[in-house]
Amino acid sequence: MGLRGLFAQGLLGKEGVPSQGLAKSLSARPGTTLIPSEAHSYRADTERTEGGHKVVRLAVVQELHNHGKTPWTPAGAVLVGPQGEEWKALGVWPLKPIAPGKFRQVVVEVETMEEEARGTFILKLWSQEGGGQAELFEGVTFP
């Protein structure tokens, strides 16, 4: 079970997994359809190492408002690091549409080396509806 599973079961919180509020640092790029109203980031250690480096799981949980005119359904995401490196999301949850004018919580989870989980990131989300334009959220940091 990853962080998404913990979140879905209500087990992801400050007691066991370090978390951090992103409300003051997170911003959507101009021209986006989705506006975050609340956001938190999480970090969880795994028992794994790769090449002698500790592997961690990171999650971003956002309450997103669709201020567009059509539904927006998450399809995938990447986390873009400070040097432009990208980590494909292990998953985006839930894969349900956000109706125009409505809010929905969206969770994105990635896995990376502990050393790479430092700095300020951009979260890039794209929709099932296509259109080619990704939703970009700047100022993502992790505890």
List where the protein language model places each region.
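Extracytoplasmic
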Residues: 31, 57-59
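Short, solvent-exposed beta-strand/turn "edge" segments of beta-rich domains on protein surfaces
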Residues: 38-55, 97
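Asparagine-centered strand-capping/turn motif at beta-strand->loop junctions
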Residues: 63-68
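Extended low-complexity, serine/threonine- and proline-enriched intrinsically disordered segments
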Residues: 75-85
